[in-house]
Amino acid sequence: MSVAASASRSASTLCSPQIQQGALKEAKVPPHIWAARHWNLGLRLVPGHASVRAGILVLLIFLPSTLCDLGSVYDSSYETVIPERLPGQGSDDPGGKVSYVLLMQGQKQLLHLEVKGHYSERNFPVYSYHHGILGQEVPLLSQACHYEGHIEGVPGSFVSVSICSGLRGVLIKEETAYGIEPLLFSTDFEHILYTMAHQPVVLCNVTPTDSLGDSSQRQGSSKTDELLALSDLWSHAKYVEMFVVVNHQRFQMWGSDVNTTVQAVVDIIALANSFTRGINTEVVLVGLEIWTEGDPIEVPVDLQATLRNFNLWRQEKLMGRVRHDVAHLIVGHRPGANEGQAFLDGACSGGFAAAVEAFHHEDVLLFAALMAHELGHNLGIRHDRPGCTCGPKHLCLMHETISKTSGFSNCSSDHFLRFLHDHRGACLLDRPWHQSHKRRDAHCGNGVVEESEECDCGNACDSHPCCEPTCTLKVGAQCSEGLCCYKCTFKKKGTLCRPAEDVCDLPEYCNGITGECPANSYMQDGTQCDRIYYCSGGLCKNPDKQCARIYGYPARSAPEECYISVNTKANRFGNCGHPTSANLKYEACSNEDIFCGKLVCTDVRYLPQVKPLHSLLQIPYGDDWCWSMDAYNVTDIPDYGDVQGGTYCAPKKVCMESICTGHATLQYDCHPQEMCHGNGVCNNFKHCHCDAGFSPPDCSSGGNGGSVDSGPVGKPADRNLSLFGVGESPDSRMEDEEINLKVVVLVVPIFLIVLLCCLMLIAYLWSEVQEAVSPGSSSTTSSSESESD
């Protein structure tokens, strides 16, 4: 039986959107559409037709094997349940078994669960970026959370849940999938149990590749002592060591939180194992890299190109750092026509052990099936043909249309056995967590600060002022890199290292004992800002500000009439939903959702620099124009022209996935009057960030403000002195200001004295001149008078 994970919220998925043309027919003045010329990426805009003139360049160096397309997913119903754990079972049970009773649709159901193996190496490395520097952390995860089992008395049922913080996972009962997850902040152990209804989910077109080369290049080909006879290969347990990379957009979709991202990936791996167990194979997470500050490679809509770029990055940056059998990239954007790409037979090869999957929705069950499907291609498994079976199911996991409640077919088993035979499966036979080395030892000189290293200057050690080539700090150095490190010493405690960038953002300060700035913190989602708007992700989701960010001041959100004209047209310039297949159309916005489709702006005085395949729509409105943008085929953000999630759309309502819904969806549960004694706000870690004059954790006593997450705030007199860049020291700034003050104190009086002396001299000279002139005038007059006599 094969299943995957629960989803806290489900969403429709994009399938190769077909561009719908057409403008606003009722407009008296025809609308103008502006598109960037492909041969000129500058600021100049050129008028064009309603369609974007774009040439498609298909460049295939290595031809990946799958072209996958997801359908739509939605939650149909839910109920609140309270799972009751039967006494005398659990972690103390040597068998690792536990049972729960819960009420499903009015009937008591007994869940029998058993702990499953660890699907990650102990202390696997997590890499992330901090101001351009790649660092490594070790996650703190419980090793015995994932349980699987069945529902008593229900044939064919299956349960896969994590039980460490409530029950979170999926239940399969009578061909129906249910998601279960704990209700946040419930004091009665309440959970949400919801039906996960769905349409056919994944469509794939397989294209075989012959570019892998001979098997002599594969990992482990020389380990002849580990090779097993063909008859033993199938029964022998196999392990796929998978390294996962999460791109920046998907990281943002997980709240830009490293811990949340790590836990989500661990859950996905555990649930993918529910599928791969059918071929006696376990997927083991050996490492994770999160692109926290942006993607180091180009991640286009075409996942075939993304796979090519990712594989080159993997060969150059990853292979020498962490050993892996396959590496998978999780991207967060809606792809063009394909939801996944993988190299066929790529596992265990040094050159082609890669795959890419799009996770732009929130159906973890569906995504786990997609990951297992793409991994199947890495393991040599092709698409099922007519006649392939997997028990009573009509569609199996490797069919072109994937069912997330089915498993591998008999044909898949044959393909996998052939892969093991042809390539001897050497890399799949070692049990990762039984090895003496959990991962590669720290490699000094790779530019990554790893365990046991104080610093790593890479190839720049000769000129590095703080770090030795041996990856140790130089004598007298306290640090090497970081926002709180200046000239190899820690910046002063309380120094501002990351200022607030929005009214919903919060500042961070150095603690004086490390070179790193604390993790970014901001006001909890749902905090009110600018009177009627709400904070989300550290930004005040004000549509006027969004327009100003795109078009510059004084652009603002357009009147309701413009939104109605644009967002009811159901085309790429105005809609409340992308097509879910090539045969469907864009969705028009209803009256309730009219402000949640495309962002419409007015008072536009400056046009933005239009990127390739971006288009602007200009329509008349009174004496002005209204503007809409389509970021078709651009993946740096979901769609720059869409109204952002969390944006105000009606009193006490916000936009979320093109729907105007209650602001409760932001899950704001802070009571600052009680939690922070009215002297602060709640941050994204659900801790108080205190106002100046009060101290954390609850803002009830005097202090300098801040939170337990922000680092200690400096004294008010020091705060202005801390507003310096990475390359400036607070001490040097203070010294400069002292020098300037001395100069002012000395120069100004001297200048005044000199000026006074000059004035006095001028006055004296002027008086002398007057005295010299006056006697001469008198004598002349007298002489004249004498002569006249």
Curated annotation (Swiss-Prot):
CDD domains: ZnMc_adamalysin_II_like (cd04269)
Coiled coil: none
Segments forming domain Peptidase M12B: 238-432
Intrachain disulfide bonds: C348-C427, C388-C411, C390-C396, C497-C517, C670-C682, C676-C688, C690-C699
Transmembrane segments: 743-763
GO molecular function terms noted in the UniProt entry: metal ion binding; metalloendopeptidase activity; metallopeptidase activity
BP-aspect Gene Ontology terms: binding of sperm to zona pellucida; male gonad development; proteolysis
InterPro entries: ADAM_Cys-rich, Disintegrin_CS, Disintegrin_dom, Disintegrin_dom_sf, EGF-like_dom, MetalloPept_cat_dom_sf, Peptidase_M12B, Reprolysin_adamalysin
Principal cellular location given in the protein's record: membrane
Binding site for Zn(2+): H373, H377, H383
Active site: E374
Domain (Disintegrin): residue spans on this chain: 441-525
Keyword annotations: Disulfide bond, EGF-like domain, Glycoprotein, Hydrolase, Membrane, Metal-binding, Metalloprotease, Protease, Signal, Transmembrane, Transmembrane helix, Zinc
Documented EC number(s): 3.4.24.-
Residues bearing attached sugar chains per UniProt: N259, N410, N633, N720
GO CC annotation: external side of plasma membrane; membrane; membrane raft; plasma membrane; sperm head plasma membrane
Signal peptide: 1-68
PANTHER family cross-referenced by the UniProt entry: ADAM A DISINTEGRIN AND METALLOPROTEASE DOMAIN (PTHR11905), DISINTEGRIN AND METALLOPROTEINASE DOMAIN-CONTAINING PROTEIN 1A (PTHR11905:SF120)
Subunit comment: Heterodimer with ADAM2/fertilin subunit beta.
Function: May be involved in sperm-egg fusion.
Identification of the protein by name: Disintegrin and metalloproteinase domain-containing protein 1
Species assigned in the record: Rattus norvegicus (Rat)
Gene name, Swiss-Prot/TrEMBL: Adam1
